[in-house]
């Protein structure tokens, strides 16, 4: 048992299963926990299929999503694995980023080959910034013909290349989740082989503290005799006292200033880092120079923009969304990080309207600039009510 207390030092990676309905995503998830439980019992509990299948609902950015979270460890890593029972849940999870993935296991039934949702999930993985994919060719016990197997593998590789993944070099592992779950030793070994491929082909993600500093401003106030303080949660990076920062977004001009103090829970700190809620004392800045919704950044690392292309999921009526479709020139509020900015929507050519429950591609023109990068997530709101959620795919200007 002494081994377990070292687990904090293991690299942590977030992954998930994606792929067509009934190709065996949930069975594979359960089977992974079983073979790892059998191989390294003191680190891994077994999570049965039923427990994953009845995934609890979560609310993320005003959208309800069913997501199952499973944890397990290989010899070298600690994994958090997400699996969604329904196809709609996948779309919502990918677009809202409810559960960010550092890599995905694409499950394709060898008996069927790639199907429409296989394509859709790979496209969503590309759009939502899932960087790496490992393929599990499932139900391999049901295909005797080696040529069919090779054909399916080829199709999957072509599909991955089509969506700008590394189709030529991506690992494709033949598995039978059901057989492994039933305790078949040979198929259990193949599943361990799949996890070895995941260990070796999904790189360790860069930690938030290693990225350039960024903090969205939540509040601004004046402390008599000390100056202006802005508060917020540091999204990424590290900031030290006396460093220079830029304040960008909302206004047309950026402001450059020096941080003369960093406070947390009324204590003074030498530095603040990703995940911490802090107050920053800014030199020579008046209360009216800064506002909620702007971002404080390491100079030159992010720029404000007004026009971008996005992919968005629009809530259905049952989810508390709109009851009617919207058309070109729709003008909702786009909520980025800590503030709403009005934007005008232009639909993709050939799209007349967007129905509640759809996922849509659109171009947005904001009336004020927002500090953004590709991959930034937002919520679409009308009068404070969430009607959709999306992600910046490409910045135009």
Curated annotation (Swiss-Prot):
Cite the binding residues for Mg(2+): 26
Q: Which reaction does it catalyse?
A: GTP + H2O = GDP + phosphate + H(+)
Q: What does this protein do?
A: GTP hydrolase that promotes the GTP-dependent binding of aminoacyl-tRNA to the A-site of ribosomes during protein biosynthesis.
| Family as reported in the entry's similarity comment | Belongs to the TRAFAC class translation factor GTPase superfamily. Classic translation factor GTPase family. EF-Tu/EF-1A subfamily.
This enzyme's EC code(s): 3.6.5.3
Gene (UniProt): tuf
The taxonomy runs: Bacteria, Bacillati, Actinomycetota, Actinomycetes, Kitasatosporales
Ranges where the record places region G4 = 138-141
Identify the HAMAP family for this entry: EF_Tu_B
**The keyword GTP-binding appears for this protein:** yes
Native species of this protein?
Streptomyces cinnamoneus
Indicate which residues the UniProt annotation says bind GTP.
Answer: 19-26, 83-87, 138-141
Q: Where is the tr-type G domain?
A: 10-206
**Record's subcellular location:** Cytoplasm
Against CDD domains, the record matches this protein to: EF_Tu, EFTU_II, EFTU_III
The domain of life is: Bacteria
Q: Where is this region: G1?
A: 19-26
Which residue intervals make up region (G3)? 83-86
| UniProt keyword list | Cytoplasm, Elongation factor, GTP-binding, Hydrolase, Magnesium, Metal-binding, Nucleotide-binding, Protein biosynthesis
MF terms per GO, please? GTP binding; GTPase activity; translation elongation factor activity
Instruction: Extract the ranges annotated as region (G5).
Output: 176-178
The primary location reported for this protein is: cytoplasm
Q: What is this protein called?
A: Elongation factor Tu
Q: How is this protein organized at the quaternary level?
A: Monomer.
Question: Which residue pairs form cystines in this protein?
Answer: none
Note the NCBIfam families from the entry: EF-Tu, PRK00049.1, PRK12735.1, PRK12736.1, small_GTP
Q: Name one GO cellular component term.
A: cytosol
Renumbered to this chain, region (G2) spans 62-66
């Amino acid at each position: 048992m002494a081994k377990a207390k070292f687990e904090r030092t293991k690299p942590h990676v977030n992954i998930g299963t994606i792929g067509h309905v009934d190709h065996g995503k949930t069975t594979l998830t359960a089977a992974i926990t079983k073979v790892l439980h059998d191989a390294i019992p003191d680190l891994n509990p077994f999570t049965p299929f039923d427990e994953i299948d009845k995934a609890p609902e979560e609310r993320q950015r005003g959208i309800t999503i069913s997501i199952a979270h499973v944890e397990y460890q290989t010899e070298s890593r600690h994994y958090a694995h997400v699996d969604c029972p329904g196809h709609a849940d996948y779309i919502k999870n990918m677009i809202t980023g409810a559960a960010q993935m550092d890599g995905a296991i694409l499950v394709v039934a060898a008996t069927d080959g790639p199907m429409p949702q296989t394509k859709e999930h790979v496209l969503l993985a590309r759009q939502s910034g899932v960087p790496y994919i490992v393929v599990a060719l499932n139900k391999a016990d049901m295909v005797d013909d080696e040529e069919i197997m090779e054909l399916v593998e080829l199709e999957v590789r072509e599909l991955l290349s089509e969506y700008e993944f590394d189709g030529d070099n991506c690992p494709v592992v033949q598995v039978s989740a059901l057989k492994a779950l039933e305790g078949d030793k040979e198929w259990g070994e193949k599943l361990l082989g799949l996890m070895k491929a995941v260990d070796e082909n999904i790189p360790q993600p860069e930690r938030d503290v290693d990225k350039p500093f960024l903090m969205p401003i939540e509040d601004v106030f004046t402390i008599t005799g000390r100056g202006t303080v802005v508060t917020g949660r540091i999204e990424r990076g590290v900031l030290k006292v006396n460093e220079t920062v830029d304040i960008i977004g909302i206004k047309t001009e950026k402001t450059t200033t020096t941080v003369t103090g960093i406070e947390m829970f009324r204590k003074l700190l030498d530095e603040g880092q990703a995940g911490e809620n802090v107050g920053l004392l800014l030199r020579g800045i008046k209360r009216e120079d800064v506002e909620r919704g702007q971002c404080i950044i390491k100079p030159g690392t992010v720029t404000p923009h007004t026009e971008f292309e996005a992919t968005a999921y629009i809530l259905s009526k049952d989810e508390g969304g709109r009851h009617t479709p919207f058309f070109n020139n729709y003008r909702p509020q786009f909520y980025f990080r800590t503030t709403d900015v009005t934007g005008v929507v232009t639909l993709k050519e050939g799209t007349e309207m967007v129905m509640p429950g759809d996922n849509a591609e659109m171009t947005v023109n904001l009336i004020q600039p927002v500090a953004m990068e590709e991959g930034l997530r937002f919520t679409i709101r009308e009068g404070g009510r969430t009607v959709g959620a999306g992600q910046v795919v490409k910045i135009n200007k």
